[in-house]
Amino acid sequence: MPRRRIVTKRNILPDPRFGSDLLAKFINILMLNGKKSTAESIVYSALDSLFRRSNKNCLEAFEIALNNVRPVVEVKSRRVGGSTYQVPVEVRLVRRNTLAMRWIIEAARKRNDKSMELRLASELLDAIEGKGHAVKKREEIHRIAESNKAFAHYRW
C-alpha cells in the first residue's frame, strides 16, 4: 500500500492524423526534449514510407508490427532466503504496448540508415516480417522467462 496518494493515469489525446491512441503514445515515447511536432513528422513520414514499401494500411501495418514485438512474459528479480531468483511474470497489456514501442524506437535509433524516418520505417517493416532487433529482444526475454520457469511459484 503506498504511503502517498495513488497517481492517476493521464489521458493521452489521440493523434491528429489517424485518431489512434497507440500512435499518440508512440509519438510521445519517440519525442525528445519536448519536440512533439518533430516526433510527429518523423512517425508520419515513416508510416508513409512503410505504406509505399508494404502496400498495407499505415495503421494496420503499425499495429501488426507492434503485435509482433509485444512480450507476453518477462522476468522480475525476487529475493528469497539470501538468493535472488528471476521469476517469470505475465505482462499487463499497457506495459506490453509500452515495452514494444520502446524496443522498436530503441532498435530504430541503433540502425545506420540516413534519417530517423528511414530507420523507423525499416524497423517497423522488419517487425512486420518477424525479424529485426526489437523482435530479437522479445525472443530473448521469452527465452529467459522459459529457462526460469522453475521459479514461477515465487510469484507475488
Curated annotation (Swiss-Prot):
Q: Please explain the role this protein plays, according to its UniProt record.
A: One of the primary rRNA binding proteins, it binds directly to 16S rRNA where it nucleates assembly of the head domain of the 30S subunit. Is located at the subunit interface close to the decoding center, probably blocks exit of the E-site tRNA.
| Designated name of the protein | Small ribosomal subunit protein uS7
Q: Does the keyword Zinc-finger apply?
A: no
Q: Which domain of life does this protein belong to?
A: Bacteria
Keywords attached to this Swiss-Prot or TrEMBL record, sorted alphabetically, are: Ribonucleoprotein, Ribosomal protein, RNA-binding, rRNA-binding, tRNA-binding
Could you tell me which species this protein originates from?
Blochmanniella pennsylvanica (strain BPEN)
Q: What does the similarity note say?
A: Belongs to the universal ribosomal protein uS7 family.
Q: Which GO terms describe its molecular function?
A: rRNA binding; structural constituent of ribosome; tRNA binding
- State the GO CC annotations: small ribosomal subunit
Q: Which InterPro entries match?
A: Ribosomal_uS7 (IPR000235), Ribosomal_uS7_bac/org-type (IPR005717), Ribosomal_uS7_CS (IPR020606), Ribosomal_uS7_dom (IPR023798), Ribosomal_uS7_dom_sf (IPR036823)
The answer on whether this UniProt entry bears the keyword Hydrolase reads no
Q: What NCBIfam families does the record point to? A: rpsG_bact
Q: Name one GO biological process term.
A: translation
Q: How does it assemble?
A: Part of the 30S ribosomal subunit. Contacts proteins S9 and S11.
Tell me the gene name.
Answer: rpsG
